[in-house]
Regions:
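Amphipathic alpha-helical assembly/interaction segments
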Residues: 1-145
Length: 145
């Protein structure tokens, strides 16, 4: 059974809260040069600027994909598939964020414990998105009937 367009509203799902925590965490890391006080040589500064831009772009993409997926209210299999593609892209973007963070940590030799909360937020985001996709599988069976 579908929801009338006039009565639709955005879901207040948990991953939106996690999303903004993750985005704030990335912004803080970029703002503070990944807390690598005094460790930055000139070549590392260039690397850090490049990786910072990449991380900010990935975070923007993540917000974009989640907003797209959350704005699709599937009423047929095609819409369900569109939503699933956006969810998949969001999950892939989370893994790209993790990879970029790991590259920065390895390159600048920053201890893991400085990023623990941010890494946990990314992992929570991935798990929430996967749970959302799993719950959408039930919707697919309803749409297929």
């Amino acid at each position: 059974m579908s929801v009338v367009k006039s009565k639709r509203n955005k879901s207040g799902v948990e991953f939106e809260m996690i999303l903004f925590q993750l985005a704030d965490g990335v912004d803080n890391l970029v703002e503070h040069d990944f807390y690598a006080e005094g460790m930055l040589a000139v070549k590392n500064k260039m690397f850090l600027e490049m990786r910072s831009r990449a991380l900010e772009e990935l975070t923007d993409k993540l917000v974009f994909y989640i907003k797209i997926a959350n704005s699709i209210y599937p009423q047929c299999i095609t819409e369900w598939e569109e939503r699933r593609v956006a969810q998949g892209k969001a999950i892939g973007t989370c893994y790209a964020i993790l990879t970029n963070m790991q590259r920065i940590m390895m390159r600048l030799r920053i201890p893991d414990n400085k990023y623990t909360l941010d890494i946990q937020n990314v992992m929570r985001m991935i798990n929430s998105l996967k749970a959302w996709r799993k719950s959408d599988n039930k919707l697919k069976t309803k749409l297929g009937q």
